[in-house]
Design a protein with these regions (language model features):
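Compositionally biased terminal segments of proteins
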Residues: 1-208
């Protein structure tokens, strides 16, 4: 695991809260970054397939700041680290891995989620994350197969997902992520070009 993508405070928080998160798994950008090592990530996003009582979990966590708290959803801060705890019914397609007594979604499950995230909000970090998987791990065709395996029965509009892969307007105004990988291939213009140049492959892979 690439712990150098996290701050010292984030690692301390992860250690402190792990005893209370037996029903949760870490995913999102941080879950991916600690497996690929491609960028710095500041937030810790946890998901549970089991409904949970927000008040009970908050009592155990004792965060410094509560941002949102309702049934199945908590957003809070501890030592300046943003934490999210969400009830998310969608099952994982691959076994979780263990890191510091925490369950972490496999990078392949997070890859599928990155397609979905891009279709919903298209943040620059999400584009970079999916790009990192495609540069470092698998082909476009394999990534599309992973997405279908995870979400084929979920009712997600695959045409919308496809169009979102080349819609960069919202991402353009966001800051660049802090990367641990260097080179012209990792510049934002190269990331955009990759998706544009491979859109036919994505179309074939997503719309089978």
């Amino acid at each position: 695991m690439f712990e150098n993508v996290l701050s010292k405070e984030a690692i301390e928080v992860a250690d402190a809260i792990s005893p209370f998160l037996k029903d949760f798994y870490l995913a999102g950008g941080t879950g991916l970054a600690i497996q690929l090592g491609h960028r710095v990530s500041m937030d810790l996003d946890f998901f549970s397939q089991t409904p949970f009582e927000s008040e009970t979990l908050l009592y155990k966590l004792s965060p410094d700041k509560i941002i949102t708290a309702r049934e199945g959803t908590i957003h809070c801060e501890q030592k300046g680290i943003k934490l999210s705890f969400l009830f998310y019914r969608e099952p994982l397609a691959y076994p979780v891995i263990l890191w510091k007594e925490l369950s972490v979604a496999d990078w392949k499950d997070i890859t599928a989620e990155k397609f979905k995230a891009i279709s919903q909000r298209g943040s620059k970090r999400d584009f970079y994350d999916l790009y990192a998987v495609l540069k470092m791990k698998i082909t476009v065709e394999e990534a599309c197969e992973i997405f279908r395996k995870r979400f084929n029965l979920s009712g997600i509009n695959k045409y919308h997902v496809l169009k979102s892969l080349v819609f960069f307007e919202d991402a353009e105004v966001e800051p660049e992520p802090i990367l641990h990988v260097k080179g012209r291939d990792w510049e934002w213009v190269s990331v955009k070009s990759y998706f544009e140049d491979n859109i036919k492959k994505f179309e074939k892979g997503l719309l089978l």
